[in-house]
């Protein structure tokens, strides 16, 4: 994945706008042509250059942008991929900092979406929502283990 706006691209846009302003003038000097040639050279070198890498804070910013509220992992989640053999563990730094990576590669490191919980799930109920008899049994079972008739403190 390349950066959204690289320096050569910004330079080309700036140069191109300036050149268009100059074209409106009837007289074109050699300095204007040189300036345009320099801009075209900068643009062509950025187009032929390989994809850029993301490291450090730039990598974290890109992951936060791509994954949003889900969060992300620095290593691939367990069970990732279809190979049964244990391959050496690679992480996002190996894939995007030492080599270039694209948007799909970044998305592979996003945490899965959490399933929406119902408003009244059983675990979400407070102790005050239970009938008194269930509440006493529940509190007794959570503070002590039982083996037969004997109660042991945990």
Swiss-Prot record:
GO molecular function, one term: insulin-like growth factor receptor binding
Any single GO BP term: insulin-like growth factor receptor signaling pathway
Region: B, residue numbers: 50-78
Cystine connections: 55-97, 67-110, 96-101
Keywords recorded for this protein, A-Z: Disulfide bond, Growth factor, Secreted, Signal
Chain intervals with Basic and acidic residues compositional bias: 126-139
Keyword Disulfide bond attributed: yes
Transmembrane regions listed in the UniProt entry: none
Compartments (UniProt record): Secreted
InterPro entries on file: IGF-I (IPR022341), Insulin-like (IPR016179), Insulin-like_growth_factor (IPR022350), Insulin-like_sf (IPR036438), Insulin_CS (IPR022353), Insulin_family (IPR022352)
UniProt keyword annotation of Disulfide bond present: yes
Primary localization class, coarse: secreted
Span list, region D: 112-119
Region listing for A, in residue ranges: 91-111
PROSITE patterns membership: INSULIN
Residue ranges, annotated region (Disordered): 121-154
Pfam families, per the entry: Insulin
Record's function text: The insulin-like growth factors, isolated from plasma, are structurally and functionally related to insulin but have a much higher growth-promoting activity. May be a physiological regulator of [1-14C]-2-deoxy-D-glucose (2DG) transport and glycogen synthesis in osteoblasts. Stimulates glucose transport in bone-derived osteoblastic (PyMS) cells and is effective at much lower concentrations than insulin, not only regarding glycogen and DNA synthesis but also with regard to enhancing glucose uptake. May play a role in synapse maturation.
Oligomer and partners: Forms a ternary complex with IGFR1 and ITGAV:ITGB3. Forms a ternary complex with IGFR1 and ITGA6:ITGB4. Forms a ternary complex with IGFBP3 and ALS.
Similarity comment: family membership: Belongs to the insulin family.
Name of the protein: Insulin-like growth factor 1
